[in-house]
């Protein structure tokens, strides 16, 4: 009887520690999810306010912005150069998250997200990777995509074909 009691006591103790450990992990992810979500909201808010310095401080030094046009793949410095005139003229973008998902790597230093955004282009999708650098979440890669409802995809393809056929040939010839 004593062996059975010791065994069940051992199982109970292991179970409690497992539950507490899982709870701590969930609390950490919950805290980090809130931090990342706030960072992304503030990131979008800085763009809407045309606050160049604040907006670009959310990017890691080594980061990439991928825009809606197939030719728009910029490192941070190139994106800053491209965006500066828009910020100077206060003609920036205003994105508001409608729905956001955040996922974590096992090391808790990398996370990735996808979100649906309310924009001047209607619904867009923002997605990217963030890294915890010196205690702050920074954007490592951001991808902005225009969503296309399935019911109109054929019309959109027809509209862009003449422009993108040229680019397709250029890319194939490289």
Predicted regions, residues:
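Hydrophobic pocket/interface hotspot
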Residues: 43, 55-56, 63, 79, ...
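A mature extracytoplasmic/lumenal domain signature
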Residues: 59, 69, 99, 106, ...
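Surface-exposed, charged secondary-structure patches
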Residues: 80-123
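Short, low-complexity N-terminal intrinsically disordered segments enriched in polar/charged residues
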Residues: 21-57, 150-153, 157-174
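Bacterial Sec-dependent N-terminal signal peptides
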Residues: 1-27
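Extended, well-structured beta-strand/loop surface patches
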Residues: 107-111, 122, 128, 132-133, ...
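Short beta-strand edge/turn micro-motifs at domain boundaries
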Residues: 123-154
